[in-house]
């Protein structure tokens, strides 16, 4: 993937750009060749995500010459990956995490980044938790529907906070549903939307709280075409579309002038400028932008495991852990490699397996 495509697919709006520029300018002036010894203390640097973005967005025109360009890229990469404090395995995991997030649909990228995963496994857990929230067969239909609507409303607020056009916001619920299907990769069907046993997949209904619109430049979730993720495919025209062109945006950000239709979305957006993370862990001091993320994090300290397997009694701190564990009893392996046909019970294992295929291809190219 080129640096330009990564930039287009994975750019986040970053906080306090003036402070970031100042820190980078001082750092590069003190240590233009990227030598150790004159570095700013690591605990005084901004979030590594800032430097990852600068590394990916850096242009040749930003430097006076090729030597300076290489030097600045090297320094930005060091500030992102921080080899002084990270092991080789941690650095590798950061690169894998970046690529994994970059290949996700835009809405899922936002969802994952908002949970601040530190490695690929945590990112997978975030997506599997979302999947289980959207489709938990053990809950009454009315409760599942309400939880789905709450998740959609929450997701819309996050998307608005990133300043996306309103036409893209209305496709969020569809994207979340597709995310659930993509993660499972359970169904195999033909171009008519039939499953392996020949039955038509049931038509999905949209919650009335969210209207579906076409999304310019992305997959049209209003009238979907056949979309394959591994061996999973989805039928054409399965969603009913509604429009609400009268949507208004009455809340304005004083910092950048962006408009929002919800006051809560404006509050979330303003944290981009302030860098605010109001939900702090009293045990370790780690801060989060959302209370739900803090609740999940606190289970690391408390040892709480509210999700219990009915087969063997083993308990887990997150629902996704229970779902993965239950596949030991059922033998279910829903994640299949399209290149060799090998199946896995967890999507993270399939992701690692696919990386080996890609690594083998890269080695063959290098040998040639």
Swiss-Prot record:
Function per UniProt: Transcription factor required for myelination of differentiated oligodendrocytes. Required for the conversion of oligodendrocytes from the premyelinating to the myelinating state. In the developing central nervous system (CNS), involved in the maintenance in the progenitor stage by promoting the cell cycle. Specifically binds to the 5'-TCAT-3' DNA sequence. Has transcription repressor activity in vitro.
One Pfam match: SCAN
Zinc finger (C2H2-type): 251-273, 279-301, 307-329, 335-357
Source species of the chain: Pan troglodytes (Chimpanzee)
Classification via CDD domains: SCAN
Chain positions found as Phosphoserine: 132, 142, 274, 292
Gene from which the chain derives: ZNF24
Protein name per Swiss-Prot or TrEMBL: Zinc finger protein 24
Keywords: DNA-binding, Isopeptide bond, Metal-binding, Nucleus, Phosphoprotein, Repeat, Repressor, Transcription, Transcription regulation, Ubl conjugation, Zinc, Zinc-finger
């Amino acid at each position: 993937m080129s640096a330009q495509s990564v930039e287009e697919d994975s750019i986040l709006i970053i906080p306090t750009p003036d402070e970031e520029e100042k820190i980078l300018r001082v750092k590069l002036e003190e240590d233009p060749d990227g030598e150790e010894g004159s570095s700013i203390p690591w605990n005084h640097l901004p979030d590594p995500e800032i430097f990852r973005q600068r590394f990916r967005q850096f242009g040749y025109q930003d430097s006076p010459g090729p030597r300076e360009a290489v030097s600045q890229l090297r320094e930005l990469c060091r500030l992102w990956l921080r080899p002084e404090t990270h092991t080789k395995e941690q650095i590798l995991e950061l690169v894998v995490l970046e690529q994994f997030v970059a290949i996700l649909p835009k809405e899922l990228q936002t969802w994952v980044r908002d949970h601040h995963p530190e490695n690929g496994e945590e990112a997978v857990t975030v997506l599997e938790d979302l999947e289980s929230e959207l489709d938990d067969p053990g809950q009454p239909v009315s409760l599942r529907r309400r939880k789905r609507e709450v998740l959609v409303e929450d997701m819309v607020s996050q998307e608005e906070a990133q300043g996306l056009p309103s036409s893209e916001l209305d496709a969020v619920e569809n994207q979340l549903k597709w995310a659930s299907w993509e993660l499972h990769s359970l169904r195999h069907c033909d171009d008519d939307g039939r499953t392996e046993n020949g039955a038509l997949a049931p038509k999905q209904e949209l919650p009335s709280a969210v209207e579906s619109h076409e999304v310019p430049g992305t997959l049209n979730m209003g009238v979907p075409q056949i979309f394959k993720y591994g061996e999973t495919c989805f039928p054409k025209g399965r969603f009913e579309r509604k429009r609400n062109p009268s949507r208004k945006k009455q809340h304005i950000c004083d910092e950048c002038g962006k408009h929002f239709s919800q006051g809560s979305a404006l509050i979330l957006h303003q944290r981009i400028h302030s860098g605010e993370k109001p939900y702090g862990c009293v045990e370790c001091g780690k801060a989060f932008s959302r209370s739900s993320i803090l609740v999940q994090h606190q289970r690391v300290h408390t040892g709480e495991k509210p999700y219990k397997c009915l087969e063997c009694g083993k308990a887990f701190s997150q629902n996704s852990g229970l779902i993965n564990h239950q596949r030991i009893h059922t033998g279910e392996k829903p994640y299949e490699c399209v290149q060799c046909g090998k199946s896995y019970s967890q999507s993270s294992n399939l992701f690692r397996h696919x990386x080996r295929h890609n690594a083998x291809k890269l080695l063959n190219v290098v040998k040639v």
